[in-house]
Amino acid sequence: MTNIRKSHPLMKIVNNAFIDLPAPSNISSWWNFGSLLGICLIIQILTGLFLAMHYTSDTMTAFSSVTHICRDVNYGWIIRYMHANGASMFFICLFMHVGRGLYYGSYTFLETWNIGVILLFTVMATAFMGYVLPWGQMSFWGATVITNLLSAIPYIGTNLVEWIWGGFSVDKATLTRFFAFHFILPFIIAALAMVHLLFLHETGSNNPTGITSDMDKIPFHPYYTIKDILGVLLLILVLMTLVLFTPDLLGDPDNYTPANPLNTPPHIKPEWYFLFAYAILRSIPNKLGGVLALVLSILILIFMPLLHTSKQRSMMFRPLSQCLFWILVADLLTLTWIGGQPVEHPYIIIGQLASIMYFLLILVMMPVASMIENNLLKW
């Protein structure tokens, strides 16, 4: 008799995706982040659901409803801080996951990679709208500044911004629609993640060497389930350490002041995970140019398969490309730091140089390094 997990229509899908899935025998801990992102999404949906039960999306009561959650709701404070810091953990895992894809050439799985980039944009949109909901000073001004960027689009810009706002400024209509979108998007993300997995399982996983592993596969369970559980435990350890000891470490103190349209904070900045893109935006004096650079800083990922000039897939045996990859990581950390600094000397010039370096590395230096390495193979 066939095992029920292999014959039952529903369990068969789960079995083929998480139990009997043939996986390469040599994938490292860098392959843990996919499952960690799944766990992050589940944590965010669950904590978000419980927060939504007590939150009111009205400009008059939004801020006090968040205060009420923290003060009066049973364990409301832990749910709120798990949700806020869970977003940070989500982005840490996302950046590691994308970095792994760049390093090991996983972007050659075109469909999987493209869905992944769409997922990245969707998660960023969700996080941005979620940051607006507590209706603190940084929520309000962040929403005003970022939505206002769309006015740089020629001809339709102003109308587009007012359409998104639902009026002539960020107000009640904006908050209500942002709450609606923030609630629905995680479920769309979950659906997209399933499509992401569907495409991945068509080709099978990549591995650190970048060469086919068809002749050396092992079952996902128990080998990688146990490995993933270790990753999950470490993720929860870091998350709960943040939540229970320094819940406001990654937040902005300005967001503990209720939103006031008449008082602009001295330094408007987004959450830490958007700072690199914000630094690129600010480093270009022209508004439309800045917006284009901002979008391109993420959209450039779509073009990675086209920029791949190497004869090898992975960077494992390409020291020159490895060096440039880690310079790119350092450059992104520099941009993140600059994004949180005021617009004054010497931060302006550092930001501009780091922005130029970012695009140069991806568009010019890495493809050229790959070609040099191709020629070195002939020696």
From Swiss-Prot:
The gene is MT-CYB. The cytochrome bc1 complex contains 11 subunits: 3 respiratory subunits (MT-CYB, CYC1 and UQCRFS1), 2 core proteins (UQCRC1 and UQCRC2) and 6 low-molecular weight proteins (UQCRH/QCR6, UQCRB/QCR7, UQCRQ/QCR8, UQCR10/QCR9, UQCR11/QCR10 and a cleavage product of UQCRFS1). This cytochrome bc1 complex then forms a dimer. One of its GO terms (biological process) is mitochondrial electron transport, ubiquinol to cytochrome c. A ubiquinone binds at residue 201. Disulfide bonds: none annotated. Binds 2 heme b groups non-covalently. Its main location: mitochondrion. Heme b b562 binds at residues 83, 182. It is a multi-pass membrane protein. PANTHER family: CYTOCHROME B. Pfam families: Cytochrom_B_C (PF00032), Cytochrome_B (PF00033). Its cofactor is heme b. It is found in: Mitochondrion inner membrane. Component of the ubiquinol-cytochrome c reductase complex (complex III or cytochrome b-c1 complex) that is part of the mitochondrial respiratory chain. The b-c1 complex mediates electron transfer from ubiquinol to cytochrome c. Contributes to the generation of a proton gradient across the mitochondrial membrane that is then used for ATP synthesis. Keywords: Electron transport, Heme, Iron, Membrane, Metal-binding, Mitochondrion, Mitochondrion inner membrane, Respiratory chain, Transmembrane, Transmembrane helix, Transport, Ubiquinone. The keyword Oxidoreductase does not apply. This is Cytochrome b. The chain crosses the membrane at residues 33-53, 77-98, 113-133, 178-198, 226-246, 288-308, 320-340, 347-367. PROSITE patterns: CYTB_CTER (PS51003), CYTB_NTER (PS51002). One of its GO terms (cellular component) is mitochondrial inner membrane. InterPro entries: Cyt_b/b6_C, Cyt_b/b6_C_sf, Cyt_b/b6_N, Cytb/b6-like_sf, Cytochrome_b, Cytochrome_b_C_euk/bac, Cytochrome_b_N_euk/bac, Di-haem_cyt_TM.
